Amino acid sequence: MKIIIVSGFLGSGKTTFIEKLSKKLDDSVILENDYAKANVDKDLLKNTGKEILSLEEGCICCSKQKDFATTVMSIENTINPEYLIIEPTGLGYLSKIIENISPIEYEKIKILKPIAIVDYYSIDKIMGEYKELFLDQIQNSSY
């Protein structure tokens, strides 16, 4: 199973990107992470025809890190898709997400280079309010 992490700040276009990407990857599952109890992005992705799983009420970079690793292993053991597309909450530190998932990488699970989606029109606002988070996502992505 190849893991694709698509990070980006709130409203950057992660969900739209994942919707288009998942349609190009036949054998893929989407794992949504939302800090809130209601997962809006999960509803937006229903038209992809893909299985969509979610981890809610916390961030996979911190409070949900154990659930995250367990969920990824469970997906590999039960569904075993070719690709697992992960959309972390927009407030997640990509460095911590990578750190949390790296220990479970082995011959059956490969973490591909992370992607960060950036909304050019929001950069000034984000850099003013969330500079550390924004820079973490950019510095830890490959695309």
Please describe what each predicted stretch is.
Residues 2-126:
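Nucleotide-state-sensitive switch-loop elements of NTP-binding domains
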Residues 114, 131-143:
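Contiguous mid-protein beta-loop-alpha structural module that forms a pocket-lining wall or clamp
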